[in-house]
Amino acid sequence: MRLLVCFGFFSFTYFFSRKGTRSYFRWVSTETSNNTRSKCHKLKSESIMTTSLLSRMQIDRDLRRSTEHVEIVPQETCVHHESPDSVLTECATMSTSTHVMPNSSSTISKSATEKKTKTGSKKVTRSKKSKKTKRRSSTTVTTTTISNSKPVTPDKDKDSKDQRKQRTKRKDPFEKEWFGKECDDVTRCKVPIQEFKIAEVQLRPRIEEDQNIEVTSRDIDEADMERICKKFAKEKINPITMAEPIDEKTKILLDRVTKKPYPLKYNNEKGLLLFDERSSFYKSREKKKAEKSESNLEEDTYGQVPKLKDVQRLPPQNVFSRPGVPFWAVTLLPTEEDLVDVDPSISVGTEHLEMYHLKQVPLQTIKKSKLILNALQPLSILEDRDDIHFTPELVFSNTIRSLVHAQEMEGKRNESKSDDEGKSDKSLSFVIEKQEEFIYSRANPIETARMARRNRRSKGSSSKK
């Protein structure tokens, strides 16, 4: 019994000691590994910080040295000089389009680098993002070298601010660069666009160009002439009754006639029209006593004298007459002096058209000729054309032609309207097919319907024969 108890105790201690040592060693190993990792991260971050700070300090020193005496020459290599006098002597062929930065770029770079180091130090303290900090630090170094690699000339520090403003200033949309124009300076000349528009766009002539016109006469169609004559014949057969004009006496009588009729009295018992009572419509009015009116002197209104605004509109002061129309626009009848050497007016009507249809009146035609119309032709040339194109015989014949053509146009319009109305008035016909009807018995509907159909078909075939 004692042996068994001892054996169990020793086995339990052995097993427990083995398991405990394993867990203890595991705990110690994990703690040491974490400590070593944190130390490594700290060392790496400190090394990165020292390298980034040293690199930035070196870049700032290089920039200070380089910005003392450096100039940019277009399409040439940059040259380092020891003194500003040598710059003027050796680099005399400089272009005016070089971009110059102020001497305060070193201070700007310092402030920028300080800000960047602060942000970088905050990022480095985070041990979990060590790899990201490495990449960011490398990118910041490269960006600083690119951004601050613009050397500055010491001779043009005063004009640097103006040039910076010119670069930042937006281009005016109303300006255009013109290199062909000669200027005092070598700089580009800026000229407004309006000057170019005036120079480039060709001014259109206000006066229209000459027009070549051919003068001809249009012949009359005989079919249209016959149709017009038939129309006039129908109008003669069925003349339109026109109301005769009223005489002056009848007008006076119509004005005196009372417009209000007298009221009619009906007998309530029989309902018959009896007579008119004047007294019932016109009520008797009591005569008022004539009041004594005192005689008052009335002031003169000077109604016969024209007003000042009408006087100011008279021709010497103003071209407008009293109704507000200029004096040259007022229609005036021609005087006897105006009618001298003027042919009497000729009225053209249906009678002349019938005479032309019966070939009693010949129409005069003008020869085909070409004219050049110009707005600035002399008056003598225009007056010479009156004897050719405006003779009384030619004007008469042209008016008859115009009447026929006008009637032709009206006839075509009426025909088109009648066609449209006829199309709309046409009656619509629908073909309705009669459905077959059968009488069948409810006891045997199918067979009875078939028998009825056969009988109908046999009757139809016999009737056709």
Curated annotation (Swiss-Prot):
Organism from which the protein derives: Caenorhabditis elegans
Record-linked InterPro entries: DUF851
Transmembrane segments: none
Identification of the protein by name: Uncharacterized protein C45G9.8
Region (Disordered): 95-173, 407-426, 443-465
Biased composition regions of type Basic residues, renumbered to the chain: 118-137, 451-465
A Pfam family it matches: DUF851
Composition bias, Basic and acidic residues: 153-173
Compositionally skewed regions (Low complexity) per UniProt: 138-150
